[in-house]
Regions:
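Short, acidic Ser/Thr/Gly-rich low-complexity loop/linker segments typical of extracellular
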Residues: 54-68
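Structured interaction patches on ligand/partner-binding surfaces of diverse proteins
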Residues: 30, 61, 86-111
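Canonical tetratricopeptide repeat
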Residues: 180, 214, 248, 283, ...
Length: 327
């Protein structure tokens, strides 16, 4: 019984740590701001959205063939670029913003050479196709939603939340607004509220992959592992090439003690997106330690630091690698 209690306490610490991973990049020194710009190849008209993975943020722009996108006044942290091109679908690109990645002038320039395999077509078209239920959303609620996104682009989170609350009060079926409320709640540590919002988003739009995978994520954080296994499993079935879905399912299996299945899904997440903001390498590191494989654990950490040079605890990780290699 003591061993079980110890394992449960270890799992709770692990989940709290991994939830903190999403905001860990806020540990960078406050003050410097950064800029992301780039171009898309092959040239195409595209909608480009930048989401904050570690803190509430959203900004969007539209690019014409050959033109560049640009996002300014960014705080350090993890971001996700979403590119939607009509006829091809949706592609995502993680971006880590910090001193090492941005260089001396605080600017990151990306050349996105997008292949067909980078795009999710059917699911993206579903997402960008408005259902009859969503068409019934009032113009006032849509205006609240647009203004909330503008607030997020200016880092005005409180105002964004108020506007999103107004939007769902006017239009309770507004799934995207519920999902944004849940994302902000999760990123600010209000997990009960996040779960409530993600459940409502999924109820109002059962096809919403974002609501599905986000609900799976908060259920892991809350240690509701039976439900987490269900929802994250559904997310992987819906989009097997989604790194977040694979990473969260791997973490869920880790927490229930199914290490082989955890390893399978975490390795798939890393293969899909080795830079993913959920950092599946850190859970895989723990698995290798539990299985008594210090060299594999050290290798995972080395790979992680290569991809995340601005990680706040890089120095401690390097010391851990040296210790593991000496065993």
């Amino acid at each position: 019984m003591a061993r079980i209690r110890q394992e449960l306490q270890s799992n709770r610490r692990m989940v709290r740590y991994l939830a903190g991973v999403l905001v860990a990049s806020a540990a960078f020194a406050a003050g410097p701001v950064y800029e992301i710009s780039g171009r898309i190849l092959p040239r195409a008209r595209a909608s480009v959205v930048l989401f904050g993975a570690s803190a509430p943020y959203s900004a969007s722009t539209f690019v014409f063939p050959g033109s560049e996108f640009r996002f300014k006044k960014l705080q350090p942290g993890a971001y996700v670029l979403t590119i939607f091109i009509r006829g091809r679908g949706e592609a995502r690109q993680p971006v880590e913003v910090g001193p090492a990645t941005a260089g001396r002038h605080g600017r990151i320039f990306l050349t996105l050479r997008l292949k067909d395999s980078d795009f999710v077509l059917a699911a993206a078209l579903d997402q960008h196709t408005v259902s009859a239920k969503q068409l019934a959303i009032s113009p006032a609620a849509r205006r609240d939603y647009r203004e909330a996104l503008k607030d997020l682009s200016k880092h005005n989170v409180d105002s964004a939340v108020r506007r999103l609350d107004d939007a769902v009060e006017r239009a309770p079926q507004f799934s995207a607004a519920w999902n944004n409320l849940g994302t902000i709640a999760y990123q600010t540590g209000k997990y009960d509220r996040a779960e409530e919002c993600f459940r409502e988003a999924l109820k109002q739009e059962p096809r919403s992959f974002e609501a599905l995978v986000n609900l799976g994520g908060v259920l892991v954080t809350e240690q509701k592992l039976d439900e987490a296994l269900d929802y994250n499993g559904q997310a992987v079935l819906a989009r097997p090439n989604d790194a977040l879905a694979q990473s969260q399912l791997g973490l869920t299996y880790y927490l229930i003690g199914s290490l082989d299945l955890a390893t399978k899904h975490l390795e798939q997440a890393i293969e899909i997106d080795p830079l993913h903001f959920s950092h599946p390498q850190l859970v895989l590191f723990r698995i290798h330690l539990r299985q008594g494989n210090p060299n594999a654990a050290a290798g995972v950490l080395e790979d992680f630091l290569t991809r995340h040079p601005d990680w706040p605890w890089a120095s401690n990780m390097r010391s851990t690698i040296v210790e593991l290699r000496s065993r």
